[in-house]
Design a protein with these regions (language model features):
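Acyl-donor-binding surface of acyltransferase catalytic domains
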Residues: 1-45, 185-187
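Ligand-binding pocket scaffold of soluble enzyme catalytic domains
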Residues: 40, 55, 105-106, 167
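A conserved beta-strand-loop-helix scaffold within acyl/acetyltransferase catalytic domains
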Residues: 68-125
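Conserved acetyl-CoA-binding loop-helix of GNAT-fold acetyltransferases
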Residues: 4-5, 124-127, 133-150, 155, ...
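Short amphipathic alpha-helix that is part of the acyltransferase structural core
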Residues: 30-73
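Residue-level recognition of the GNAT/N-acetyltransferase active site
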Residues: 128, 161
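Conserved active-site loop/cleft motifs that coordinate metal ions or position small ligands
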Residues: 105-107, 156-159
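Conserved active-site alpha-helix within GNAT-family acetyltransferase domains
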Residues: 1-13, 134, 138, 162-181, ...
């Protein structure tokens, strides 16, 4: 490979996956076990308080992404920086609860007016330690897809690390297919 000859080796591989058509429609269905409740961020703030919810959100995020170069190790400043965009909508952050314990979250992103053909994105979805291994990942992904489709999305995409086998399997099970493959090279 010419990159190896030039002294570069792949250091990160990122896949773009997408879902549309009948697969997208099918992916809007979800169900959580009894006692597990999905709340959008404003509703969670009303119920538990914004400071508490933000702290629990950060804990779940950092548990889910302890290994991730961009998404892990967040603090409140980093979360606020991420929310300080023109596309951020608090009601596009879905939080998953069992009593007052935050199990996970799904933050969706709109790339413009969904009803005018803009794409929706699975921006960040993660389960904290208390939510893992319980079969909640698929329904949590689908809950976000449901939100985007209800608002008019006809295509939803996401980025995923190529070596994140559990996430890849989960997204493929939902109906996502790989549409792009990005490779970051570093000089060796």
């Amino acid at each position: 490979h010419f990159t190896h000859h030039l002294g570069y080796t792949p250091s990160r591989e990122l896949l773009v996956m997408a879902i549309d058509g009948d697969s997208l429609t099918a992916a809007t269905a979800y169900q959580f076990p009894d006692g597990v409740e999905l709340l959008d961020l404003p509703t969670a703030y009303d119920r538990y308080g914004s400071e508490t919810v933000d702290q629990l959100w950060l804990e779940a995020n950092n548990q889910a992404f302890s290994w991730h170069p961009e998404q892990g190790g967040w603090d409140l400043d980093r979360l606020n920086q991420a929310r300080d965009t023109d596309w951020y909508r608090p009601d596009d952050v879905l939080t998953l609860w069992e009593n007052s314990k935050l199990l996970g979250f799904h933050w969706v992103k709109r790339h413009g007016d969904l009803r005018a053909g803009a794409k929706g994105e699975v921006y960040v979805v993660g389960l904290g330690d208390a939510g893992r291994g319980r079969g909640l990942g698929g329904p949590l992904v689908n809950a976000g897809i449901n939100r985007l489709v209800a608002e008019g999305a006809s295509l939803v995409f996401l980025y995923v690390e190529a070596d994140n086998e559990p996430a890849l399997r989960a997204y493929q099970d939902v109906g996502f297919v790989v549409v792009e493959h990005h490779v970051l090279y570093t000089q060796s």
